[in-house]
Amino acid sequence: NEFLPKNRLIVYTEGRNSPREEYRSNGRGNVQQMPIIVLVDEISASASEIFAGAMADYGRAVIVGDESTYGKGTVQIPRGLADYLPYFASQEGCGMIKVTVQKFYRINGASTQLKGVESDIVLPMSTAALPIGEAEMDYAMPYDEIAPAGHYVKNPHLARILPELRRRSAIRVAGDKDLQYSKWFIDYRRRVTEQNTDSLNKEVRRKEDAELRRIQRANDEERKPRYAAMAEQDARNFTIYRLTLDDVQADKLPIASKDDEDKYMESAEDPEEALEDDVDYPSNLDPILREALHIVRDMMDLR
């Protein structure tokens, strides 16, 4: 509603025994002209996929993150099992089941089921190492398509600049030590998952664990001075505001402080658990958020 004009189609639902239903924007549209990045990963599901799909179909936003989202494109309703018992039977403890009755369909006619929403720019997300998503589920419903909405118009601007956005992002990712480490760790986790075996030899396991900890410690040590320099540069280049549910209605957003960050800090009692968590991201911007900021800058530069 904030990103589209009034009465724009957002998503269809359609089922075997139910008519097509349309869901449209109410047209508040306070940020219709600003460049938008939608960050997604393989855990982004259902409503977040509907949002990402609509923004992509209208050419309103660049989708950034994992190769695709989760792929949960079905609608369920609860059915009480007591309704199926004999009239005078006890209904105590009958419970209920969720029955799939419809699918979601994007404006372009594609279902979000199974395939999800594909990213325009793929980044090395931590979730990429995990075998998750609707496609990994047993008996998942298939992907399908219906006729696209005949009256929607996609803004062609993002499609024109997308090749250049991808080129610039790829150059930055190739030179970003944090994102390259993420790519290494994704490949490592995939190898371990595909191998699907663990040695029963205690010494072998100890050597494997020690090598992984060595790599993690070396990565942490490399990051500390680099992150300190990045934080100083951020202080010169950025003004970072705090935005929480308490601040949404405020006339002016407060400046973010270190105290705000400390509220969300994680603590680890085990020194080994502290690996990779004891080096704070500069300005609370992880590598994915930082690259997303660069992409937004590119979008503004190419307008």
Which residues are covered by each model-predicted region?
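Conserved acidic, small-residue-rich alpha-beta core segments centered on
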Residues: 1-146
